[in-house]
Amino acid sequence: MLRALSTLGARPLGRPPAQFLLLARGRKTRHDPPAKSKIGRVATPPAVDPAEFFVLTERYRQYRQTVRALRQEFVTEVRRKVHEARAGVLAERKALQDAAEHRELMAWNQAENQRLHELRMARLRQEAREQEQWQAEEAAREAREAEAWARLKEQEVLQLQEDAKNFITRENLEARVEEALDSPKSYNWAVTREGQVVTPQHKGS
């Protein structure tokens, strides 16, 4: 056998392998004639003790059951180790991914907070400017109203002073009575419900 294998190993390169016939022992086929010493021989199985057969069968069953349990335990342990190793790698990879995602989210959050802070400060400055402008406009409006009110009161005072010149006092009472008697203006008239002035009609007119 070793010699045949050595010849196979010593085959030069580039040549196809040659066919070798190796001797092998085996069972006869059903078409081969029996040996001369076996002609007329009847094969009888050995006697089997029932008790021993039962014991052997039970022991083989227990053996196969034990081997099956051990094999299942070994397979479970190997699978558990593989799962733990894979889970450890996956857990580490997931932890790295989570850490990277956390850093990205923190950076985005900081940038968003900065943007919102700038918008808030701009809005507060705009509101302050609008408040100052409104206060200035309100002060100007109040100043204009005060000035207009002062002018109105001044005109009222002047008008009152002008009207006071025509007031009837104790000193000019006689003169005003004489003036009213001498005046040709007639106050003998009436006003209708429609607002029309009705003057009396003299007979000679």
UniProtKB/Swiss-Prot annotation:
Keyword vocabulary terms for this entry: Mitochondrion, Ribonucleoprotein, Ribosomal protein, Transit peptide
Annotated organelle transit peptide span: 1-26
GO MF, any single term: structural constituent of ribosome
Compartment list: Mitochondrion
Keyword Zinc in annotation: no
CC terms in the record's Gene Ontology section: mitochondrial inner membrane; mitochondrial small ribosomal subunit
InterPro entries the UniProt entry points to: Ribosomal_mS26 (IPR026140)
Superkingdom per UniProt: Eukaryota
UniProt GO BP: mitochondrial translation
Subunit structure: Component of the mitochondrial ribosome small subunit (28S) which comprises a 12S rRNA and about 30 distinct proteins.
Matching PANTHER family: 28S RIBOSOMAL PROTEIN S26, MITOCHONDRIAL, SMALL RIBOSOMAL SUBUNIT PROTEIN MS26
Family indicated by similarity: Belongs to the mitochondrion-specific ribosomal protein mS26 family.
Annotated protein name in UniProt: Small ribosomal subunit protein mS26
Native source organism of the sequence: Bos taurus (Bovine)
